[in-house]
């Protein structure tokens, strides 16, 4: 594989040990032709990118995107269509599409390359299509084949999962931007050559996190949920899917209480979690994480002071090294702890992922 994959291999991420992503890829290989082996490394990379981005986006939330959640999202016994599951399906589908598209454009995969279908055509006043456009069509095709094939159900939950898979792929399409290069005498830029390029995946993660924050709950009664693949079950859900919602994340069921430990749902609770307080570079939401993770879950915020060592007083020495000293300083870190003698923390119950 090429540069994109090598970056992750250099970071110590070996594909046979990718955990949740490898689990999903293995599920796919059971039912797919051996020809698709060509793309499994790129798909596994994409799945891992999705996991890491999910962890980043939810690092300071009560539900912090544990890696096992990516396994549970395809496990028949644990197929709850919650707000969190909607994000998992979307980010995984988007990340796989992203990784395959980038590897394709770099020439790392067989049977695909840059999208040159528009090259030479006039795109607008003063510019023409050219260069190497990212092949999002191919990336979307492979993502759909891999991810959607994991959904074996035919009930309302399955349709919701497939909808969110597609919303993730639409997020990748929404991130494409036109990049141009000037041509002309003495840099006059009399004409430009332009191509389509995917944005950094962090932008897609931010986009999908915003979709998660305002995800739409589809109201269905228990009779409709049990309808399975009967006509009334499919029709009831189809009626809810208006064209305007195709890029939105949707869910059916409220979230469990993420404040408290629940072994049956593999929820660890927030006790022992670190939170941010007085951090200058933190966002407003991150600044409020101690209240969200600790106080609102019936826990207290405990300050722990520790010595941190960092490089400082660096000087360039001829030739050609940089020598640094070591500086020590005391830093404060904050954790959610249970008050002495208190009972189990009490959270807000349903929809308490915030």
Curated annotation (Swiss-Prot):
PTMs per UniProt: Palmitoleoylation is required for efficient binding to frizzled receptors. Depalmitoleoylation leads to Wnt signaling pathway inhibition. Proteolytic processing by TIKI1 and TIKI2 promotes oxidation and formation of large disulfide-bond oligomers, leading to inactivation of WNT8A.
GO cellular component, one term: extracellular region
Keywords linked to the UniProt accession: Developmental protein, Disulfide bond, Extracellular matrix, Glycoprotein, Lipoprotein, Secreted, Signal, Wnt signaling pathway
Compartments, as annotated in UniProt: Secreted, Extracellular space, Extracellular matrix; Secreted
Induction: By retinoic acid.
Biological processes, Gene Ontology terms: cell morphogenesis; endoderm development; establishment of animal organ orientation; polarity specification of anterior/posterior axis; polarity specification of proximal/distal axis; regionalization; regulation of protein localization; Wnt signaling pathway
Top-level lineage group: Eukaryota
Disulfide bonds: 54-65, 104-112, 114-132, 180-194, 182-189, 259-297, 275-290, 294-336, 312-327, 314-324, 319-320
InterPro entries: Wnt, Wnt8, Wnt_C, Wnt_CS
GO MF annotations, alphabetized: signaling receptor binding
Principal location class: secreted
Cleavable signal peptide: 1-19
Summary of subunit composition and partner proteins: Forms a soluble 1:1 complex with AFM; this prevents oligomerization and is required for prolonged biological activity. The complex with AFM may represent the physiological form in body fluids.
UniProt family annotation: Belongs to the Wnt family.
Known role: Ligand for members of the frizzled family of seven transmembrane receptors. Plays a role in embryonic patterning.
Protein name as catalogued: Protein Wnt-8a
Species name: Mus musculus
């Amino acid at each position: 594989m090429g540069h994109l994959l090598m970056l992750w291999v250099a970071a110590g991420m070996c594909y046979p040990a990718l955990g949740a992503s490898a689990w999903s890829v293995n599920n796919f290989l059971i039912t797919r032709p051996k020809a698709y082996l060509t793309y499994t490394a790129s798909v596994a990379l994409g799945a891992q990118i999705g996991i890491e981005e999910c962890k980043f986006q939810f690092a300071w939330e009560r539900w912090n995107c544990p890696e096992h959640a990516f396994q549970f999202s395809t496990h028949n016994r644990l197929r709850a269509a919650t707000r969190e599951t909607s994000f998992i399906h979307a980010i995984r589908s988007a990340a796989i599409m992203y990784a395959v598209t980038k590897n394709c454009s770099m020439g790392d995969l067989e049977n695909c390359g840059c999208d040159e279908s528009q090259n030479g055509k006039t795109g607008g006043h003063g510019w023409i299509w050219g260069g190497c456009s990212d092949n999002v069509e191919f990336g979307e095709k492979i993502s759909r084949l891999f991810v959607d094939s994991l959904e074996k159900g035919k009930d309302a939950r399955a349709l919701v999962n497939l909808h969110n898979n597609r919303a993730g792929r639409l997020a990748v399409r929404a991130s494409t931007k036109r990049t141009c290069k000037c041509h002309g005498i003495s840099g006059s830029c009399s004409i430009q050559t332009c191509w389509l390029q995917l944005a950094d995946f962090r932008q897609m993660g931010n986009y999908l996190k915003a979709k998660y924050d305002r995800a739409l709950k589809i109201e269905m009664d228990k009779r409709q949920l049990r309808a399975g693949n009967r006509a009334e079950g499919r029709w009831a859900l189809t009626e809810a899917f208006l064209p305007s919602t195709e890029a939105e994340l949707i869910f059916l069921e409220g979230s469990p209480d993420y404040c408290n430990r629940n072994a049956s749902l593999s929820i660890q609770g927030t006790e022992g979690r670190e939170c941010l307080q007085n951090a200058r570079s933190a966002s407003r939401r991150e600044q409020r994480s101690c209240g969200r993770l600790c106080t609102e879950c019936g826990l207290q915020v405990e300050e722990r002071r520790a010595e941190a060592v960092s490089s400082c007083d660096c000087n360039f020495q001829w030739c050609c090294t940089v020598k640094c000293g070591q500086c020590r300083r005391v830093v404060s870190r904050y954790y959610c702890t249970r008050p002495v003698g208190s009972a189990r923390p009490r959270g807000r119950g349903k929809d308490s992922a915030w």
